[in-house]
Amino acid sequence: MTAILERRESESLWGRFCNWITSTENRLYIGWFGVLMIPTLLTATSVFIIAFIAAPPVDIDGIREPVSGSLLYGNNIISGAIIPTSAAIGLHFYPIWEAASVDEWLYNGGPYELIVLHFLLGVACYMGREWELSFRLGMRPWIAVAYSAPVAAATAVFLIYPIGQGSFSDGMPLGISGTFNFMIVFQAEHNILMHPFHMLGVAGVFGGSLFSAMHGSLVTSSLIRETTENESANEGYRFGQEEETYNIVAAHGYFGRLIFQYASFNNSRSLHFFLAAWPVIGIWFTALGISTMAFNLNGFNFNQSVVDSQGRVINTWADIINRANLGMEVMHERNAHNFPLDLAAIEAPSTNG
């Protein structure tokens, strides 16, 4: 015992710091990824809160027409947002010291770039920290793999899409109505609803919600009764107990009779793998779709593809979507474009008579 105490005393300050950082006995695990995660996420969160409350209007389109996004400049929780960095900045790295003054930095939307870049670094480190803690505890690494789906989605809308479009001004605004505006403009310019990767993402999110609700309700409904009929089944259990609290055979039998036998899992591991993989793979595909549409590889275009024997167009749902896309296209950034791209691309009629 004495030798152990002496060895601890002789350990260097750096060694003690390393042991503290990587200790799984801390109430919250820090880890080496946490050393980078904590300051980046604190910075992103602090600047977001300050900018959401008090940032002045931002010249998002680079045409000297600032757009207000903060609460003190007339917005509420729904309409407020951190306005993306100006199109005049493009993809340039724009820290505070690159601007002539803080006022110029705010006018050009510097906070957006600061928040987004720190946030992406922070969530990537959070993913690494999940792996690191799993490694220290001897667990398998799939928690971090599952978290890679939302990380990929955030990276797609905040970094890959602006890179593909040539400006951070095309990134998703950090606010509720700003997110909706981003979605509408994305549909107008890329026809995302007709992209198969987006369809897979919808199936992943809605299917994941359905399977989660089905699984949770089925487990809760098939508890092994440890009590009498006169008291709650909840009284028969204690939090964190080692014994199984529900009967998977009973759940399998119920679900197999409700639908059909092979629609029900009789193996808990394969069931939970399915519950994790379904939404994760769907969101991976959506992030991949956003990242390809960033470079204008857009959704399917079936416009005016059905005609009768006389060559007259028979409108399909695709044509209705196309008309809606044109309407959204001409309305967004209305002062920045003399000719919206979709309309300007049409060949002008001949005037030679």
Swiss-Prot record:
Enzyme class: oxidoreductase
A family per Pfam: Photo_RC
Post-translational modification: Tyr-161 forms a radical intermediate that is referred to as redox-active TyrZ, YZ or Y-Z. C-terminally processed by CTPA; processing is essential to allow assembly of the oxygen-evolving complex and thus photosynthetic growth.
Membrane association type: Multi-pass membrane protein
PROSITE patterns: REACTION_CENTER
A single Gene Ontology CC term: chloroplast thylakoid membrane
Oligomer and partners: PSII is composed of 1 copy each of membrane proteins PsbA, PsbB, PsbC, PsbD, PsbE, PsbF, PsbH, PsbI, PsbJ, PsbK, PsbL, PsbM, PsbT, PsbX, PsbY, PsbZ, Psb30/Ycf12, at least 3 peripheral proteins of the oxygen-evolving complex and a large number of cofactors. It forms dimeric complexes.
Record's function text: Photosystem II (PSII) is a light-driven water:plastoquinone oxidoreductase that uses light energy to abstract electrons from H(2)O, generating O(2) and a proton gradient subsequently used for ATP formation. It consists of a core antenna complex that captures photons, and an electron transfer chain that converts photonic excitation into a charge separation. The D1/D2 (PsbA/PsbD) reaction center heterodimer binds P680, the primary electron donor of PSII as well as several subsequent electron acceptors.
Name of the protein described by the UniProt record: Photosystem II protein D1
Organism in which the protein naturally occurs: Amaranthus hybridus (Slim amaranth)
Organism lineage string: Eukaryota, Viridiplantae, Streptophyta, Embryophyta, Tracheophyta
The encoding gene: psbA
